[in-house]
Design a protein with these regions (language model features):
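A short, surface-exposed loop/turn module that caps and links secondary-structure elements
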Residues: 31-57
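Residue-level recognition of specific faces of alpha-helices
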Residues: 14, 32-35, 47, 76-79, ...
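Enriched for short, Lys/Arg-rich terminal
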Residues: 4, 23-24, 59, 67-96
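Arg/Lys-rich, positively charged N-terminal/basic patches that mediate binding to nucleic acids
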Residues: 1-30
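A generic structural signal for secondary-structure junctions
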Residues: 19-20, 34, 41, 91-95
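Residue-level recognition of oxygen-bearing side chains
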Residues: 10, 53, 85
Length: 96
């Protein structure tokens, strides 16, 4: 069963910027996001405390935060950033 993947604008902008600076990191993140379409909760993913329904995967020094909507088989990538900035970005996007 495949899930559709939707990437919010801010996460997409981060990936575009990263692909110009560090191509291999951007490719690894994009591969990990594509993998979420087949396995939305891969080994090593973690639910985020204080954020109901939001999951996190690590890709090197980067974090991908996303939601899974089982009713429509959708993975929504909310934010992608470095470890030290991803949680601030997540709070901004969720208005917390």
């Amino acid at each position: 069963m495949s899930y559709s993947i939707e990437i919010l604008r801010a996460a997409d902008k981060f990936l575009d910027k990263l692909s110009k600076q560090q191509t291999s990191d951007a490719e690894a993140i994009e591969e990990a996001i594509e993998g979420l379409g087949e396995t939305p909760r891969p080994p090593g993913c973690k639910p985020l405390k204080g954020y109901s329904g939001i999951w996190r995967i690590r890709v090197g020094n980067y974090r991908v935060c996303y939601q899974v909507d089982e009713s429509v088989l959708l993975v929504l990538v909310i934010t992608v950033s470095t470890r030290d900035k991803v949680y601030d970005a997540l709070r901004r996007h969720l208005g917390r």
